[in-house]
Design a protein with these regions (language model features):
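RecB-family 4Fe-4S metal-dependent nuclease core
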Residues: 1-219
Length: 219
């Protein structure tokens, strides 16, 4: 579909605002005293809403949602900051597979590094957060981001072990969901991905409109 001529208050815009809020808030975190964190969160969200959401009703609705999740975001961020320090925010990255003449590129929301040089990768979700089973079979986003990170494919990042990759749900159901590396190791998923790309490059492989059914129900 074509892009709308004028901005509309859709889920895409909401995602842009939420991602910008988290990026700016994390950058402000080191200079923000604990007692001032909620106020700073509200200030950043208000500035983004005023600049990008000119519809009063949507502005009021999104404002209430953002303020309602402020305490949860701050509490979760305090936990994350004890594990590692933010190293990459909204970073671009890529990994070249020369034997396949294929480049995997992506934008990662955030990568933290622990004192032991382990990497923690996070992706913000304003919609539904994929379950571990969905990630294992259908949604490989965290796996592919982690594979790029582990090979040092993102800007300002050296190769290192990805200890954990997780979705941070910022929607109505606030949720933290890690990738099931215990059920499917990252190295195994990466080999499967390379095999998939190699099979697609074969003249004998057709491109299916749907690889598998995501959900089956009566209606």
């Amino acid at each position: 579909p074509l892009e709308p001529i004028e901005p509309v208050p859709d889920s895409r815009l909401r995602g842009v605002i939420y991602h910008a809020l988290m990026e700016q808030f994390i950058k402000a975190w080191p200079d923000c005293a604990p007692v001032d964190r909620r106020r700073r969160f509200v200030e950043i969200s208000e500035a983004l809403l005023c600049a990008q959401v000119p519809w009063p009703s949507h502005q009021a609705f999104w404002r209430s949602r953002l303020r309602a999740m402020a305490d949860w975001v701050i509490a979760e961020e305090e936990r994350r900051q004890t594990r590692g320090q933010p190293l990459v925010l909204e970073g671009r990255g890529a990994v070249l597979l020369p034997e396949l003449q294929f480049t995997l590129s992506a934008i990662v929301d955030r990568i933290d590094m622990s004192q032991g040089a382990g990497l923690y990768l996070y992706d913000y979700k304003t919609g539904a957060v994929p379950t571990p089973d969905q990630q294992k079979v259908f949604d490989k986003q965290l796996y592919l981001l982690a594979a790029i990170a582990q090979q040092g494919g993102f800007e300002n990042l050296q190769p290192g072990e990805v200890v954990e990759a997780a979705f941070i749900g910022l929607g109505a159901a606030k949720k933290y969901q890690a990738a099931p590396f215990d059920k499917e190791p990252l190295a195994q998923a990466w080999e499967k991905f390379k095999h998939l790309i190699a099979s697609y490059q074969s003249e004998e492989t057709g491109f299916q409109a749907r690889r598998a059914l995501f959900r089956v129900e009566d209606y």
